[in-house]
Design a protein with these regions (language model features):
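C-terminal accessory module of base-excision DNA glycosylases/AP lyases that mediates lesion recognition
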Residues: 186, 190-193, 204-207
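Short beta-strand-to-coil "C-cap" segments at the C-terminal boundary of structured domains/repeats
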Residues: 197-202
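A short, polar/charged loop/turn motif at coil->beta-strand junctions and beta-hairpin connectors
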Residues: 8, 20, 51, 74-76, ...
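Short, cationic low-complexity segments
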Residues: 208-254
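Short amphipathic alpha-helix that is part of the acyltransferase structural core
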Residues: 1-40
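Short hydrophobic/aromatic beta-strand or adjacent loop that forms the aromatic wall/cage
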Residues: 40, 191-196
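Conserved beta-hairpin
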Residues: 26, 40-59
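Acyl-donor binding region in acyl/amide transferases
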Residues: 13-16, 39, 58-186
């Protein structure tokens, strides 16, 4: 059954916003409660004068390497990485894809040819929103660099280690010990990091469509808004650990 059109969207608008404002929104509202390294620009979605959505884009330390694997001649100012997305749960269906389409228009107007992003990482989210919004899929890698504290907060170990906050003797003990040293009691989340690319330039899209992979399906858990919904499908985690944070070690039960 098809859903009715979301009437809220007729009163919405998307505009660039300052990084200071985006950081405040992201660290308060996004499920990770963190600000991404290398953030370069941000966009707000406004409904009746209120900010009900935020997208942050920029350059992580691995952005260039991942882009150049697929587009070797593209220039730095022609690509960017979508790093954070938050949409208020008060907004109706299709709000995220609606905002994403308008952000892509703004990026296109500024000369961006290609956008990349990831799904999964701290959860077994295969990226349904990207699959429904014209993104292309380029596989996944095992991911064990997210740590879930006993308070339910997700922390990125790689970002923390980059600034020399972990003694060498702790580094030798592995991710679990590193997470405990940095953030207290918790568990490593063992999942996958899925790579999606949105080619804005038609020529790049035509070329990359020949290399794209089938979309992954049936995650153990997926994101709906800022909430995580158990799924009755097969778990897609890569070699799950006996204890893996909030991810179930067997297919989740609805």
């Amino acid at each position: 059954m098809s859903q009715k059109a979301n009437s809220q969207l007729a009163e919405c608008a998307v505009h660039p916003i300052g990084l200071h404002d985006a950081k405040k929104i992201t660290t308060e509202k996004h499920y990770m409660k963190t600000w991404p390294q290398g953030a370069a620009c941000a966009f707000g979605m406004f409904y009746k004068g209120r900010c009900v959505g935020c997208m942050v884009a920029g350059y992580s330390p691995t952005t260039e390497r991942k882009v150049k694997k697929w587009c070797t001649k593209i220039q730095h100012n022609q690509y960017i990485e979508l790093q954070r997305t938050w949409i208020s749960d008060a907004m109706g269906h299709n709000s995220e894809s609606w905002m994403m389409a308008r952000v892509m228009r703004i990026l296109k107007a500024s000369g961006v040819w290609l956008v990349l992003t990831h799904s999964g990482g701290c959860k077994d989210d295969v990226g349904f929103i990207f699959q429904a919004s014209g993104w292309l899929y380029f596989g996944c890698d095992p991911c064990s660099d997210f740590y879930e504290t006993n308070k339910g907060e997700f922390k990125n170990l790689v970002s923390a280690m980059r600034f020399g906050r972990v003694p060498k003797d702790v580094l030798k003990l592995g991710p679990q010990a590193i997470g405990a040293h940095l953030f207290g009691e918790g568990k490593i989340v063992n999942a996958r990091r899925h790579l999606y690319i949105y080619p804005i330039k038609k020529g790049i899209r035509r070329r990359l469509m020949k290399k794209t992979l089938p979309f992954p399906k049936n995650p153990a858990i997926f994101r709906q808004g800022q909430k995580w919904i158990p799924n009755g499908g097969v778990c897609t985690r890569h070699q799950p650990l006996p204890v893996s944070g909030s991810l179930p070690d067997s297919p989740a039960i609805q």
